[in-house]
Amino acid sequence: MYGNYRPGEYIVVDLKHMPKSIHGDEYLCVFTCLSTRLSESVYLKTRLASEFLDHYKNYCKHIRNKTGNYPKYLHSDNGKEFIEKCTSEFNKQKGIKHTYTSPHSSLQNPVAERINRTLGEGCLALLLCAGLPLMFWVYGIAFFSFVKARSPHKSLSFSNPIAAWNIYNTHRSSIDLYDLRIFGAEGYVLDENSLKNHPKAFRCIYLGPSSTHKGCNFYNLHTKKVIVSRNFVINEQCFPGRVHFPNIYDKYFGPSPPKPNSESISPSLSTTTDANGLEYSSIFDFDSHTIPTSTNLP
């Protein structure tokens, strides 16, 4: 734990501007519990204090329900969304002591700044490898946060934030990795409304486990919308984003190697004779498979 504070009592927060997402969000706000290093990311469309306050209130309620504790300290920079009157009044009403960094001194909030940078770099790596544009950063952040919360942490004696959080969690839940696959992989989602003798699945891009449903998020390549489903099959050897958004992947990793063109491969004709003196003419394709074409009897 961080000092003598119990989980949820000491919170640091930081807000970061991001490119416009597929849902119109432009800001990433990360709340971090210093005792467990467990982070929760929320997405904002503006920097208005009212929008931040709504997410802040929900986070405080979440901590109260999960741990039985209520935040005692909040540490942030001097962003206008943090120092507005409505935020200050809420902190006074709940007895939360809000401390700020000095102007232009982000080093005074090291945990929040480090986590924001880690999430940003991890999200960028996921998007580039999957060949997806930056408008999918919301799902990249959520996926990376999901993995990070279940990975060993040095400050927790190499335990993970979820395990440290569950020690004081009144509603404990085991770590479930059942829906975890490679980000950006090809997925086929069951079409619940398919007709007889019609395709039974949509070809999609896997975007990680859903935080609000018991299922996973997928980007439908046909409708260009994000859907949630629990009935799917994942092909982790294929990444449709590299083809669907070729400029993204090719810019950083170079063009993908060309696929073999079957039309440019000319099969060779070979004649063989068996022990009985019968001649067989066979076509050899590029995979070295033989297809008998004719038989010449004596």
Task: Specify the residue positions occupied by each region the protein language model found.
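RNase H-like two-metal-ion nuclease catalytic core shared by retroviral integrases
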Residues: 76-78, 82-90, 98-122, 135-145
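Charged alpha-helix within mobile-element recombinases
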Residues: 112-159, 169-172, 176, 203-205, ...
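Core residues of folded domains in eukaryotic genome-function proteins
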Residues: 6-11, 25-30, 35-40, 67-72, ...
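Short coil/turn segments at secondary-structure boundaries
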Residues: 24-26, 42-45, 86-89, 102-103, ...
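Retroelement integrase C-terminal DNA-binding domain
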Residues: 69-72, 135, 155-166, 175-188, ...
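An active-site-proximal beta-strand-loop segment
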Residues: 1-45, 50-52, 56, 85, ...
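Active-site beta-loop-alpha junctions of metal-dependent nucleic acid enzymes
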Residues: 41-67, 227, 232-240
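Conserved beta-strand elements of beta-rich interaction domains across eukaryotes
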Residues: 16-18, 34-37, 49, 79-81, ...
